[in-house]
Swiss-Prot record:
One of its GO terms (molecular function) is GTPase activator activity. Belongs to the protein kinase superfamily. Ser/Thr protein kinase family. The gene is tbck. Residues 72-425 form the Protein kinase domain. It comes from Dictyostelium discoideum (Social amoeba). The lineage of its organism: Eukaryota, Amoebozoa, Evosea, Eumycetozoa, Dictyostelia. Residues 657-844 form the Rab-GAP TBC domain. This is TBC domain-containing protein kinase-like protein.
């Protein structure tokens, strides 16, 4: 039996849990607390599972899969001519205007070519829903297109087994009504969730008892709040959205596809509260038309249903004209005579006028009160008298709230925020752990401390210090160091898929995916030929389904005949619950296996290459769970603490593995993006002004990664345009926009969809780090330098491939400029680009040169057999590159290559004696196929073969230890050099000499060949003590 004081005291014990959540990256989800019981006893046996206590508090958390079918929008051009039949030229001569194309929403199955725009738009809207976060909302996890039915979408969300509907059924069986204060708490939490949704410009529209779930702590979780928004207010589906019992009168009057405002949810809340109080819905009936008539009757309309205040029931009656008062009549006449208002808007306003009559609703509420009072006095009544507590069992304030919710006219009905400010809810706000009790001053003050610190006693200070220490550990017990975290629904779903979960298979296994007969896949609208129109229509017993017959006859030669079939798809609110016990068990095992100390030690060993324990992380779910836990800690510190302390740790952990579920947050932290500063900068840019590159953006965006569902959606185009425009306006002094910036911005937009400030700030930081020298009005010199470095690196690692490219005259300028000017974003799909950028963001800015070299080396066997034309064609195959191998090879090449090969070695205003540091004309440097290195790389690596091509006399006077004196003019030099092939070779040559010899080694296909910049002169200047000098004068 439910306690009567549950609604008041139910949340009071959760304050400490909420404090634990204050220090976690995620605020809502599955809570995990783990702590070492023997930590205070200095027990160093951290690998003993018996020393760790792990608790997974799921509160009944489940994942639900909700399939629904959508429709595509088909536009039919009404061209003059023979469409579906013959036409005469005279029939069009009297045409006043060319008919406009008409759009119809149709099922995919009847269309030969699959239409994807509806899918893309639905997926883009789903990303907005997945960004919502509230304690009383079930998390919207994802919307995924079905792999089996291209007109079906699968909604994945947080869910629970218990609901208000089931709770009422349980209370009815026990003959125990839900207490008044519990109903009040339900109303408060539902209103909190609705208020949050409405503040995000979202309408639930489908609020009902079965969509209001209860977790194991009896806290409200609203579900299925995204369908109305996903379906473009019902336009993309062939079924009406919403439970008829709780549908507002204005929604009924505007039709199934009419857009509902947020106050429709307030009406639904009033209906639900009344349902809970009575224990049943008083206007419920198996006939939908009767239900709508009863609701409209209570809203002031004259219908075939009326409420008998004596029998306290609805009954059939004759339809009478709706009575309106004199003021309403004047408004009615005003709208009816106004020619400036459209017919649709005029009809809507007239309907709203009729909703101003509250008499029926007031009589209805008062009758229910009187009935309950009479029943209580006589201790008798209807069979439903013991199911609900009744209106008289509620306080006056809660009854007032219900009455305000059920005001027929939405203009007079209060919104959710206004209702939430009702004095009745103050009691619940005071004990609400999520209610912000004060404004934090200063910004860095602890959430645990009160606003006034002057009057704190020593005991209070110690108590707050104790809470703070618990928070840092996550609320563990026993005083031991704890590892606590909260995993969001998206992360739980990610773990479930790593464990082999598949939503399509889950639906099949549980009987939710059933094969439909082919007739059920017929489209709602099909174009038919005129010769078939008569025979088709003659077989129909119903009137013409599309427009009036005379209208259709009038335009029969201007557009195709449209036959509307019966709605083949009816909304099914069934959903498939996914069992997650295996996921929770794996989380417990992971926390026991990898405590923080054990994990830190593992990282150190992995970085030192002493342990292979952390290899193959992609297939190791235990490690991924812990890595995400550690990232949660670091990302929280980065956002709310000192980012300079957490950023290096994020770097180190990201080198181990970047979880796809956190990639956007990790990238922005690596790039040094601060959320508050990003919003300030982005909001300071006036995007309303006309920009110099707006036209170019409009041309580029529709061609940018249009295979990607988010980037090809309408919302994706809008957001990408705004981000590019913001960057352009911020960089007006550069005076140019380089095509390809849209490709660079795309990955950041994908990971920060509906968060334009962070996407923009990430783009800005990325461009500043990797592309600042290229995105300038004159970037010829910078591009030429990059091309030369790339060519020299290719010669260093694969001279045979470079020689062949030079032989067929396939210059890097012909194929690789888009690689570098977009950091490969132009040529690679987003999924491969993400893997590439995971490494690029963690390494020096020279890594793209190595990636470019490794990318083309991957196709070397094919390229070596090609001529120029085939080679150009081959470059179009680069997107098929194995990106994992490319990154691995690039990092291997990077580690084998002297660092100074990619570093500029010239300094302006250099002393003439330091000739090797003076700038060399680029045309002269272009002749060098090899890279140059500095003396630091020569000294630090003793494994190099050093070839000194100075004269024997010069070599005898002074030379570098272990160097070999070689005569570059020997006739059998190539045979002599073969013994050094495959080793790192450094050439020491006199000033202005050695280029031909070093180039010759490259042409002989010697890899790892470089020249010491400055030769012996640089060694005498910087490493004189290391040289061997002859004693002879």
């Amino acid at each position: 039996m439910m306690k009567s004081d549950e609604g008041v005291s139910g949340n009071s014990n959760n304050n400490n849990n909420y404090k634990f959540k204050d220090n976690t990256f995620r605020k809502y989800g599955v809570e995990v607390v783990a702590y070492d019981n023997n930590n205070n006893n200095n027990n160093n046996n951290n690998n003993n599972d018996d020393n760790n206590t792990v608790t997974v508090n799921s509160r009944g958390f489940h994942i639900s899969i909700h399939p629904f079918s959508f429709r595509n929008k088909l536009t039919i051009n009404q061209n003059n001519g023979s469409i579906g039949g013959s036409s005469s030229s005279s029939s069009t001569s009297n045409s006043v205007s060319t008919p406009k194309p008409q759009s119809f929403y149709v099922d995919d199955a009847g269309i030969a070519k699959q239409l994807n725009q509806s899918v893309f738009d639905i997926l883009s809207r789903s990303r907005y829903l997945s960004s919502l976060s509230h304690e009383n909302l079930a998390e919207f996890i994802a919307a995924e297109p079905s792999q089996k039915h291209h007109d079906q979408m699968l909604i994945v969300s947080e869910d629970y087994k218990n609901s208000l509907e089931k709770q009422i059924e349980i209370q009815a069986k026990r003959q125990t009504p839900i207490p008044s204060n519990t109903i009040g708490r339900y109303a408060y939490q539902i209103l909190k969730a609705l208020s949050y949704l409405h503040s995000q410009d979202l309408t639930h529209r489908s609020l009902s008892l079965d969509n209001i779930k209860l977790d194991d702590n009896n806290q409200i979780k609203l579900t299925n709040y995204g369908l109305y928004y996903l379906s473009d207010h019902g336009e993309n589906v062939s079924f009406p959205i919403g439970n008829l019992l709780y549908l507002s009168p204005e929604s009924i009057l505007r039709g199934a596809k009419g857009s509902s405002n947020t106050k429709a949810d307030v009406w639904a809340l009033g209906c639900i509260l009344l349902h809970i109080c009575l224990g049943y819905c008083i206007w419920q009936d198996n006939n939908p038309s009767i239900v709508t008539n009863r609701i409209l009757h209570l809203s002031g309309y004259s219908t075939t249903q009326s409420f008998n205040s004596i029998s306290k029931s609805f009954e059939q009656c004759e339809l009478k004209k709706t009575i309106i008062n004199e003021k309403q009549h004047e408004e009615y006449e005003e709208y009816d005579d106004d020619e400036d208002i459209s017919e649709e808007e005029k009809e809507k306003r007239i309907k709203d006028i009729k909703l101003n009559n509250r008499d029926n609703m007031n009589n209805f509420i008062n009758s229910l009160k009187r009935e309950e009072k009479e029943n209580s006095d006589s201790n008798s009544g209807s069979s439903n008298s013991n199911i609900g507590i009744g209106l008289n069992g509620l306080g006056k304030e809660l009854i007032e709230i219900i009455e305000q919710c059920l005001i027929p006219n939405p203009m007079d009905r209060p919104d959710s925020e206004t209702l939430l400010d009702h004095p009745y809810f103050n009691e619940y706000k005071n004990i609400d752990p999520y209610q912000l009790q004060w404004i934090i001053k200063p910004f860095t003050k602890s959430w645990d401390l009160p606003d006034s610190l002057e009057s704190l006693t020593l005991k209070e200070i110690e108590s707050y210090g104790h809470i703070g220490s618990d928070n840092n550990g996550g609320g563990g017990g026993g005083g031991g160091e704890s590892d606590s975290d909260i995993y969001s629904g998206k992360e739980i779903y990610y773990f479930w898929k790593l464990l082999g979960g598949n939503i399509e298979k889950e639906l099949v296994n549980k009987g939710f995916a059933k094969a439909s007969p082919s007739v059920h896949k017929l489209p709602l609208y099909v174009p038919v030929k005129a010769s078939l129109t008569e025979s088709t229509n003659s077989g129909l017993n119903s009137p013409q389904p599309y427009q009036h017959q005379h209208h259709q006859h009038q335009h029969q030669h201007q557009h195709p005949n449209i036959i509307k079939s019966k709605n083949s798809t009816v909304y099914n609110n069934e959903f498939c619950l996914v069992e997650l016990s295996n996921v929770f068990l794996k989380i417990k095992e992971s926390f026991k296996l990898y405590g923080s100390k054990v994990f830190e030690e593992g990282i150190e060993q992995s970085n030192n290459n002493n342990n292979n324990r952390f290899n193959n992380i992609e297939n190791n779910i235990e490690l991924q769970i812990i890595i995400i836990r550690e990232f949660h800690k670091l990302l929280y510190q980065y956002q709310y603490d000192d980012p300079t302390l957490s950023q290096p740790k994020i770097y180190r952990l990201a080198k181990l593995f970047v979880p796809p579920i956190l990639r956007g947050d990790i990238w922005s932290s690596i790039l040094g993006v601060n959320e508050r500063e990003a919003k300030q900068l982005y909001n300071s840019i006036n995007l309303d002004v006309k920009g110099p590159n707006d036209k170019q953006f409009e041309l580029d965006i529709p061609r940018c990664h249009q295979y990607h569902p988010l980037l090809s959606s309408r919302q994706g185009h809008v957001q990408l345009f705004k981000i590019l425009k913001a960057w352009s306006l911020l960089n007006l002094e550069k005076g140019c926009y380089w095509q390809g910036l849209d490709n660079v911005a795309s990955p950041f937009l994908v990971h920060h969809f509906f968060n334009e400030p962070i996407a923009f700030a990430s783009l800005k930081a990325f461009v500043d780090k990797y592309l600042s020298i290229l995105y300038v009005p004159n970037n010829h010199a910078a591009l030429s330098e990059i091309m030369l470095i790339y060519q020299q690196l290719l010669a260093y690692h694969d001279p045979e491939l470079l020689n062949h490219l030079m032989d067929i005259q396939l210059d890097p300028n012909l194929y690789s400029i888009p690689w570098f000017i977009t950091v490969f974003a132009h040529i690679l799909p987003i999924d491969k680009l993400e893997i590439l950028w995971d490494s690029i963001l963690l390494c020096p800015s020279s890594l793209p040169n190595f990636i470019a070299a490794s990318m083309i080396i991957q196709f070397r066997d094919s390229i070596l057999k090609m001529n120029f034309e085939d080679g150009i064609t081959m470059m179009s195959m680069i997107p098929s590159v194995d990106v994992h191998k490319c990154v691995s090879d690039a990092l291997s090449m990077f580690n084998k290559t002297p660092l100074s090969t990619t570093v500029t070695k010239f300094v302006s205003n250099t002393d003439q004696e330091l000739w090797w540091m003076q700038e060399v004309p680029f045309e002269k440097r272009k002749l060098e196929l090899f890279p140059r290195i500095d003396i630091h790389d020569l000294i630090n690596d003793q494994q190099k073969v050093i070839l000194d091509i100075r004269t024997p006399l010069q070599f005898q006077q002074i030379h570098y230890p272990s160097s070999i004196n070689v005569n570059p003019k020997l006739s059998k030099l190539q045979q002599q050099m073969e013994q050094y092939k495959g080793q790192q070779i450094v050439v020491i040559a006199p000033k202005d000499q050695g280029v031909d010899f070093t180039n010759q080694l490259i042409q002989w296909k010697f890899p790892f060949v470089s020249m010491l910049n400055g030769g012996m002169d640089s060694l005498e200047h910087g490493a004189h003590s290391l040289l061997i000098i002859s004693n002879k004068n």
